From Swiss-Prot:
Function: Catalyzes the attachment of glutamate to tRNA(Glu) in a two-step reaction: glutamate is first activated by ATP to form Glu-AMP and then transferred to the acceptor end of tRNA(Glu).
Main location (coarse class): cytoplasm
GO cellular component: cytosol; protein-containing complex
Similarity comment: family membership: Belongs to the class-I aminoacyl-tRNA synthetase family. Glutamate--tRNA ligase type 2 subfamily.
Pfam families xref list: tRNA-synt_1c (PF00749), tRNA-synt_1c_C (PF03950), tRNA-synt_1c_C2 (PF20974)
Disulfide bonds: none
A GO MF term: ATP binding
HAMAP family for the chain: Glu_tRNA_synth_type2
Sequence motif 'HIGH' region, residues: 100-110
Originating gene: gltX
EC number: 6.1.1.17
Record-level GO BP terms: amide biosynthetic process; glutamyl-tRNA aminoacylation
Stated name of the protein: Glutamate--tRNA ligase
Enzyme class: ligase
Length: 555
């Protein structure tokens, strides 16, 4: 690993004339070496170690070492082909489903299930059903029905059929009635606390022994609204080792008006009943779900067995641990209503809309979720891996510009006006050049110190004379880069004060970073990707009268 890291850091250091950018190097290391993406912590430790070695080398020594480590150039090794994930027991046509609750738009946690279902149905030429599980009226956000489908379209997930559970209540009633008639379910009017105490002891409640005929009468009264505070329970094993499986509920009364049905219905199925009926009737062959649903799988198998239905192939994958942005839909919604968040695409949120606004490309997220796959072990979501995959997508089209954040004005004496031409992209000459015109006054981001020498990138060396009233006064020293190296001068980027363009960059914490970009930044359009050198990749969001608004995508 050390030689690999060393090679990438050397390449980066040489590119920036002896001042390596470890974050940029990390992105390229992970982007071009997928086997290292699960070892981010170790890679960071090696980077810290290698940086100390590189700091002692001259540029010539760095180049010699790079030639030794990668004589044919980086990224030339043949990448070992990753074994493609597969489904077990594929017989005939594959049918799968993605089944979110329409309580809000999709977030990054939903991306795994939606992408993997899409991946497998495309791989096996199968069918993907989007099932909107909206039988809990209290959790439904009306606009989410459309938002979810928009999110899936953006992600590249192809849906063949859309099912809305609140439109299928009569179907669930039919199968609920059949379970009661067969003696596998009963109407229970026990107090919730009373039933819970009995269940914990493995003791059946008084309602369990009622005949199917008696239960059908109560069922009809439930539907007609003649009774309240009752539920339908499925008969399981009252002595089951897991108390939650003992006679779990499959229907309950809910008087909250539904966004789609209003008050037309008040008896609603619970998840384990509606999911099982739908999976059977829609012909699901394989069901992907988190391992936190293993107990639900066992509950649903009771219903499959009572009806004599074929049980689909269940695949339970590990939990995807995502740190950072807010993922709780209820917290996001509350924050939007209170004004804490600007909307569902606020940069602090983990929604797909927020990722999209920041500049994450769907193909990068899709690729990463397929790589994470269906392993049963829990997985930590590594943002570094997403950023590396995203950089692979956007880097080739991202024009380069200088951006000066928190700008400090520098007045330089003793230097002639000068024009320099820089390429818009180091590897794509067809994207053209950009022009910087030095006329004695520039902006820099760095805090400069009096008496020290600095190298202005692609220009010359200066020495700071004094700082007065927040203006830095410096004088021209020399053109030679070797002089800067011998004086251990920091290499800093800059832009001319004249014609500079105000830019606000919104970061992942929704903080505004104010600064200026060079004049040729004016060629960009909405949704363009740009790399602000030594700052990071940004997505251009909009042009305003006083400048541009961009979102920080990643470093």
């Amino acid at each position: 690993m050390k030689d690999t890291v060393m090679a990438y850091l050397l390449e980066n250091s040489i590119k920036f004339k002896g001042k390596p950018n470890p974050k940029a190097a990390m992105g390229k290391i992970l982007g071009e070496n997928p086997d290292l993406r699960s070892k981010v912590k170790e890679v960071n430790e090696v980077i810290s170690e290698v940086l100390k070695e590189i700091e002692t080398m001259s540029l010539e020594e760095q180049q010699a070492k790079l030639d030794e480590l990668a004589p044919e150039g980086l990224g030339q090794k043949t990448e070992r082909k990753r074994k493609e994930i597969e489904l077990k027991n594929v017989k005939g046509n594959v049918a799968m489903r993605f089944a979110p609750n329409p309580s809000g738009p999709l977030h990054i946690g939903h991306a795994r299930a939606s992408v993997l279902n899409d991946f497998f149905t495309k791989k096996y030429n199968g069918k993907l059903v989007l099932r909107l599980e909206d039988t809990d009226a209290k959790r439904v956000l009306p606009e989410a029905y459309e938002m979810i489908q928009e999110d899936l379209n953006w992600l590249g997930v192809k849906v063949d059929e859309v099912i809305v559970q609140s439109e299928r209540l009569e179907i669930y009633y039919e199968y609920g009635r059949k379970l009661i008639e067969m003696g596998h379910a009963y109407v229970c009017d026990c107090d919730a606390e009373e039933f819970r105490n009995l269940r914990e002891q493995g003791i059946p409640c008084k309602c369990r022994d009622a005949t199917p005929e008696e239960n059908i009468v109560l069922w009809e009264k439930m539907l007609s609204g003649e009774v309240e505070n009752v539920a339908v329970r499925l008969k399981t094993d009252i002595a089951h080792k897991n108390p939650s499986i003992r006679d779990f509920p499959i229907f309950r009364i809910e008087r909250t008006p539904h966004p789609k049905n209003g008050t037309k219905y008040h008896v609603y199925p619970l998840m384990n009943l509606s999911v099982t009926v739908d999976d059977h009737l829609l012909g699901m062959t394989h069901v992907l779900r988190g391992k936190d649903h293993i107990v639900n799988t066992e509950k649903q198998e009771y219903i499959y067995n009572y009806f004599g239905w074929e049980i689909p192939e269940y695949i339970h994958y590990g939990i995807l641990k995502i740190e950072g942005p807010v993922l709780s839909t209820s917290k996001m919604h509350a924050g939007i209503l209170s004004g804490e968040y600007s909307g569902w695409d606020d940069a602090r949120l983990g929604t797909l809309r927020a990722l999209r606004k920041r500049g994450i490309r769907p193909e990068a997220l899709y690729k990463l979720m397929v790589e994470i796959g269906i392993k049963q072990a829990d997985v930590r979501f590594a943002w570094e891996n997403l950023y590396a995959a995203n950089k692979d997508v956007i880097d080739k089209d991202a024009r380069r510009f200088f951006f000066v954040e928190s700008p400090k004005k520098v007045v330089i004496s003793g230097a002639e006006n000068k024009k320099i031409d820089l390429r818009m992209h180091p590897d794509r000459s067809e994207l053209g050049n950009r022009e910087l015109l030095f006329d004695g006054e520039i902006y820099v981001s760095d805090d400069l110190e009096a008496g020290k020498m600095y190298r202005l990138m692609e220009l010359f060396n200066i020495v700071v004379e004094r700082i007065e009233n927040d203006i830095i006064y410096a004088k021209y020293d020399s053109d030679d880069l070797a002089v800067a190296k011998s004086n251990r001068a920091s290499i800093i980027h800059w832009i001319p004060v004249k014609d500079s363009i105000p830019v606000t960059v919104i970061d992942e914490n929704a903080e505004n970073i104010e600064g200026f970009a060079e004049k040729d930044f004016a060629v960009v359009k909405k949704d363009d990707f740009v790399q602000f050198e030594r700052f990071g990749f940004v997505r251009v969001d909009e042009k305003e009268d006083n400048g541009y608004i961009c979102y920080l995508t990643h470093k």
